[in-house]
């Protein structure tokens, strides 16, 4: 029998919008945030309260960002998180929040979390710092707007990438099934990858779009963002998933699903 993960029940029928933290508002993050805005509206059309998203990013919009990331000339010099959230709120009529800083930080206590954490960063340290923070609350079994339940991580090189969603909680309650093997736990990215063996390279900011495209090709970020958000959408809409991620290779046009 195939393994399956049933979505945490709280997310399917919450009393208020499901809280989401998006960490990083660059190439992938800007695409993910826009997809989440559409997802929230679709969920509301189905009778769900939708999403409340908080975006974290301390960086400002540069000339090299325009074209590959979802920013315009009029936003040069502005904070990325503030620019994106302001645009989303005006377009969709939301009241989402922007935080022009990193997460976690000293300004946030252990109970200042969200139901779903989405990381769209390009460095290892931020993932390890976040995991250290989340491990402090992973044994909690309460369900409210601040209870962290899932962590979805996006990562990519120039033309390859992956998205993986895992459970922050050690176990998510699963119903019995005669067709599948319910899996209460899915590994998060830091449980899949031994980052201690990976040497992180500091590439520095790009000075132009052409230089930025040498590091990350034009459509790798948006491709990953759409696939990852589709996985999340189906977890809401269908209440289950047979897959916890995917590997993408734009050179070969191949996509490999990661089963639960």
Tell me what each language-model feature is.
Residues 1-5, 10-16, 78-82, 88, ...:
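Localized chelating/binding microdomains
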Residues 2-28, 32, 123-260:
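Glycine-rich phosphate/adenylate-binding loop
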Residues 18-46, 54-62:
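Glycine-rich adenosine-cofactor-binding loop
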Residues 20-23, 51-60, 100, 116-119, ...:
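Extended hydrophobic secondary-structure segments that form protein cores and membrane-embedded regions
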Residues 36-44, 70, 134-138:
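Active-site catalytic pocket residues across diverse enzymes, especially alpha/beta-hydrolases
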Residues 44-51, 142-147:
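Short helix-terminating capping/connector loops at secondary-structure junctions
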Residues 49-93:
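Glycine-rich phosphate-binding loop and adjoining beta1-alpha1-beta2 segment
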Residues 76-114, 121-128:
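A structured beta-alpha segment of the ubiquitous adenosine-cofactor-binding alpha/beta core
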């Amino acid at each position: 029998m195939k393994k399956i993960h049933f979505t945490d029940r709280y997310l399917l029928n919450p009393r208020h919008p499901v809280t989401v933290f998006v960490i990083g508002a660059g190439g992938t993050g800007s695409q993910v945030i826009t997809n989440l805005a559409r997802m929230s509206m679709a969920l509301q059309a189905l009778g769900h309260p939708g999403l409340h998203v908080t975006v974290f990013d301390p960086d400002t919009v540069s000339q090299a960002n325009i074209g590959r990331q979802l920013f315009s000339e009029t936003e040069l010099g502005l904070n990325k998180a503030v620019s994106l959230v302001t645009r989303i709120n005006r377009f969709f009529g939301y009241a989402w929040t922007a935080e022009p800083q990193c997460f976690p930080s000293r300004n946030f206590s252990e109970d200042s979390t969200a139901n779903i954490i989405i990381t769209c960063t390009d460095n290892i340290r931020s993932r390890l710092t976040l995991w250290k923070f989340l491990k402090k609350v992973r044994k909690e079994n309460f369900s409210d707007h601040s209870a962290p339940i899932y962590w979805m991580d996006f990562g990519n090189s120039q033309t390859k990438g992956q998205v993986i969603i895992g459970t922050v909680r050690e176990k998510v309650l699963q119903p019995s099934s005669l067709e599948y093997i319910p899996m209460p736990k899915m590994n998060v990215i830091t449980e899949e990858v031994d980052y201690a063996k990976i040497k992180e390279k500091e590439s520095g900011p790009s000075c132009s779009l052409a230089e930025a495209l040498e590091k990350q090709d034009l459509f790798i970020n948006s491709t990953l963002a759409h696939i990852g958000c589709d996985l999340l959408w189906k977890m809401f809409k269908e209440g289950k998933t047979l897959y916890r991620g995917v590997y993408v290779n734009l050179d070969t046009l191949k996509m490999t699903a990661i089963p639960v």
